[in-house]
């Protein structure tokens, strides 16, 4: 009986001490995808603090840039070069809005939700952007929980 209790206690301690593993999410920048022309796919990513988002220019002439009005407080803006992959490690809970600089007017936007109940949801809903971008962003915001 003592050995079973000791083994159970050791297993519980190891489970508590094991570090969490960050997930890696891949987002493709495409000329054409499931939701139309000039898209991030997937356009909505659910992540946890510490996760990594890899933005991959699957098709040429794309980049990823933060939408400054849709970033958690304290997170610095970012912008990749055209035709280059970009890795973003999300550290703060909240919404991270992204756009492709040359195709923003065509609606090329995406959204990353980190954690639950983002504090910057209202800012994301009211951020000014071109009509097509606003329509797509609203569709992504509908997935926030």
From Swiss-Prot:
Its cofactor is Cu cation. CDD domains: Pseudoazurin. GO terms for cellular component: periplasmic space. GO terms for molecular function: copper ion binding; electron transfer activity. InterPro entries: Amicyanin/Pseudoazurin (IPR002386), BlueCu_1 (IPR000923), BlueCu_1_BS (IPR028871), Copper_blue_Plastocyanin (IPR001235), Cupredoxin (IPR008972), Pseudoazurin (IPR012745). Pfam families: Copper-bind. It comes from the Bacteria. PROSITE patterns: COPPER_BLUE. Its main location: periplasm. Residues 1-22 form the signal peptide. Keywords: Copper, Electron transport, Metal-binding, Periplasm, Signal, Transport. It is found in: Periplasm. Cu cation binds at residues 62, 100, 103, 108. Binds 1 copper ion per subunit. Residues 126-145 are annotated as: Disordered. Residues 27-115 form the Plastocyanin-like domain. Homodimer. This soluble electron transfer copper protein is required for the inactivation of copper-containing nitrite reductase in the presence of oxygen. NCBIfam families: pseudoazurin. This is Pseudoazurin. It comes from Paracoccus pantotrophus.
